[in-house]
Amino acid sequence: MNKLPHETRVVIGMSGGVDSSVAALLLKEQGYDVIGIFMKNWDDTDENGVCTATEDYNDVIEVCNQIGIPYYAVNFEKQYWDKVFTYFLDEYRAGRTPNPDVMCNKEIKFKAFLEHAMALGADYVATGHYARVAYMDGEYKMLRGVDDNKDQTYFLNQLGQEQLSKTMFPLGELKKPQIREMAKEAGLATATKKDSTGICFIGERNFKDFLSNYLPAQPGVMQTLSGEVKGKHDGLMYYTIGQRHGLGIGGNGDPWFVVGKNLKENILYVDQGFHNELLYGDEVIATNVNWVSDRAKEKEFKCTAKFRYRQEDNGVTVQIVDENTIRILCDEPIRAITPGQAVVFYDGDECLGGATIDEVYRSGEQLDYLG
């Protein structure tokens, strides 16, 4: 039997930003028994000795007091280090480009946090993500948020039935300008706070400086695939496929791009032209596969896919190799498919799940991304 809202406890993850603030406000207005939780995942004292998490938590406290809900701070630093940051470093060490947001959602927000919330007697958890959950045809489905520009299902691709059955996304039917307006109308302390961007544990810091604190940089040669040396690179971990800026190659003609990495020889491959064929792949092997539905998949099916956040949907054919591996055949060649990143699958508005890009091929030949 369904509980009434006032009998339903919803524990919401609050970051100190406007999105989670408005999500908490909406739940409170809908009559739920709401508790705000601030997740401290990282000891993020910046160069000036200021802990930005303290500022964010103060904003959470102010908003929770404004809307009249209790709040707590919970420390997940150990879990975050073990499950997210260690993965982040391991991927860079392997010459890949990881997506820590996907792993944070999988291991922290919808695992450690969800378990903590259930221990507090929660019926549901909620977050400020732009996504929707619907119960249709006897199972939970994850749908894109109605704000195309802000939809975050790409980062939620590792969720499954268990998590979705206990999750609310109060912002899924709203667009960002509406959320700002609601925050202003309610006089919330975070109404005009700017959105955070980039990787949460790096913040405003220089990426190279941050990474070099944890991984020793190994400078090497930057060259074309034919062997023409174009300069030196600072360390393969600092570059991603399709990157243009920061290469330091002068001269006339088309701009230069990163087209590959040779980890064994510590070579960064570069070539000219945005539409250089070396940047285009038409077949992908991906692992760490997760399907939102528990129902058996066809051995081969058509859908659309995103190979990076905010990319247009691309038509693909997915072939199931085994429980943890899939082959993806692209209808058209796609630029700068990057090992380590997530590939996420859709059927219209429904997010079907996702996987991690491992190998990229063009016309049956493996691209020299991680030779």
Swiss-Prot record:
Q: Might you name a Gene Ontology BP term for this protein?
A: tRNA wobble position uridine thiolation
The source's domain of life comes to Bacteria
InterPro entries in the record: MnmA-like, MnmA-like_C, MnmA-like_central, MnmA-like_central_sf, Rossmann-like_a/b/a_fold
EC numbers, comma separated: 2.8.1.13
Q: Where does ATP bind?
A: 13-20, 39, 128
* Site, Interaction with tRNA: residue positions: 129, 341
Q: Where is the active site?
A: 104 (nucleophile), 200 (cysteine persulfide intermediate)
Q: Name one GO molecular function term.
A: ATP binding
**Where would you say this protein principally sits, based on its record?**
cytoplasm
What Pfam families has UniProt attached to this entry?
tRNA_Me_trans, tRNA_Me_trans_C, tRNA_Me_trans_M
Q: Which HAMAP family match?
A: tRNA_thiouridyl_MnmA (MF_00144)
**What is this protein identified as?**
tRNA-specific 2-thiouridylase MnmA
Lineage of the species this protein comes from? Bacteria, Bacillati, Bacillota, Bacilli, Bacillales
